[in-house]
């Protein structure tokens, strides 16, 4: 009898853990950013910072770019990643989009955008090092407000990165999200590459 009760308790615990895991993945990836979401309404008052040198930042008086300027009336592919100069981001994620840029243009995409929780000056140097600035528009989310608004923020203090973002991608048409993908973990690169989003356009 005691053994039967123990087995039932263990089974209940396993089911609870499995349900929690499913809920965690769902809420993390899709609670605020889902198909049909107006990305500008989901992040009201939020602006991004276009990648540039420090001198360009000074001359522009550290101006920012409203989300409406980025998305309204345009077909945009946007992907977010944990940080400039990090492994998967540098070796796989950005190169994936850079190498497929002609395919995006052939599908009528107006811009391919990379956004990261970094200042725009660090991102600028990184983009130049990757030789990707001519193909991809890079933006900083220096205070993380954009990702927090979309429910895509992620604490990566364990990797000495602090508050960052999930690894994700989306196809956005006139501000409305048409497709969105979020990795199970920021270190994964399974569903957010260029080939996946190309198949969703």
UniProtKB/Swiss-Prot annotation:
Q: Which reaction does it catalyse?
A: [glutaredoxin]-dithiol + a hydroperoxide = [glutaredoxin]-disulfide + an alcohol + H2O
EC number, as in UniProt: 1.11.1.25
Tissue-level expression: Expressed in the whole plant.
Give the record's GO CC terms: cytosol; mitochondrial matrix; mitochondrion
UniProt keyword terms in alphabetical order:
Antioxidant, Mitochondrion, Oxidoreductase, Peroxidase, Phosphoprotein, Redox-active center, Stress response, Transit peptide
PTM sites of type Phosphoserine: 149
Q: Which GO terms describe its molecular function?
A: peroxidase activity; thioredoxin peroxidase activity
Entry-linked Pfam families: Redoxin (PF08534)
Active site at 89 (cysteine sulfenic acid (-soh) intermediate)
Per UniProt, the transit peptide runs over 1-30
Give the Phosphothreonine positions (modified residues).
37
The Thioredoxin domain extends over 37-201
TM regions (residue ranges):
none
Its induction note reads: By oxidative stress.
Q: What class of enzyme is it?
A: oxidoreductase
GO biological process annotations for this chain's record? cellular response to oxidative stress; response to oxidative stress
Highest taxon above the source species: Eukaryota
Cellular compartment(s): Mitochondrion matrix
The protein's predominant localisation is mitochondrion
Which family does the record assign? Belongs to the peroxiredoxin family. Prx5 subfamily.
Q: What does this protein do?
A: Thiol-specific peroxidase that catalyzes the reduction of hydrogen peroxide and organic hydroperoxides to water and alcohols, respectively. Plays a role in cell protection against oxidative stress by detoxifying peroxides. Reduces preferentially hydrogen peroxide rather than alkyl peroxides. May be involved in mitochondrial redox homeostasis.
How the protein assembles, per its UniProt entry?
Monomer.
Fill in the misc note: The active site is a conserved redox-active cysteine residue, the peroxidatic cysteine (C(P)), which makes the nucleophilic attack on the peroxide substrate. The peroxide oxidizes the C(P)-SH to cysteine sulfenic acid (C(P)-SOH), which then reacts with another cysteine residue, the resolving cysteine (C(R)), to form a disulfide bridge. The disulfide is subsequently reduced by an appropriate electron donor to complete the catalytic cycle. In this 1-Cys peroxiredoxin, no C(R) is present and C(P) instead forms a disulfide with a cysteine from another protein or with a small thiol molecule.
Identification of the protein by name: Peroxiredoxin-2F, mitochondrial
Source species of the chain: Arabidopsis thaliana
């Amino acid at each position: 009898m005691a053994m039967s009760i123990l087995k039932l308790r263990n089974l209940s615990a396993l089911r609870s853990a499995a349900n929690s895991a499913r809920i965690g993945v769902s809420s993390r990836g899709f609670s605020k950013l889902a198909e049909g979401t107006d990305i500008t309404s989901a992040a009201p008052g939020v602006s991004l910072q276009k990648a540039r040198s420090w001198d360009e930042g000074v001359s522009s008086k550290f101006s920012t770019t409203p989300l409406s300027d980025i998305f309204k009336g345009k077909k945009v592919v946007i992907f977010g990643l944990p940080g400039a100069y990090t492994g998967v981001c540098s070796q796989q994620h950005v190169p994936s989009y850079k190498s497929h840029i002609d395919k995006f243009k052939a599908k009528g995409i107006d811009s391919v955008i990379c956004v990261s929780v970094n200042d725009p000056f660090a991102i600028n140097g990184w983009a130049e090092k990757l030789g990707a600035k001519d193909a991809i528009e890079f933006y900083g989310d220096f205070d993380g407000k954009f990702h927090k608004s979309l429910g895509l923020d992620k604490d990566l203090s364990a990797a000495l990165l602090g508050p960052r973002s999930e690894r994700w991608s989306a196809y956005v048409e006139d501000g409305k999200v048409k497709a969105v993908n979020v990795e199970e973990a920021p270190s994964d690169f399974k569903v957010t590459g260029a080939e996946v989003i190309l198949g969703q356009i």
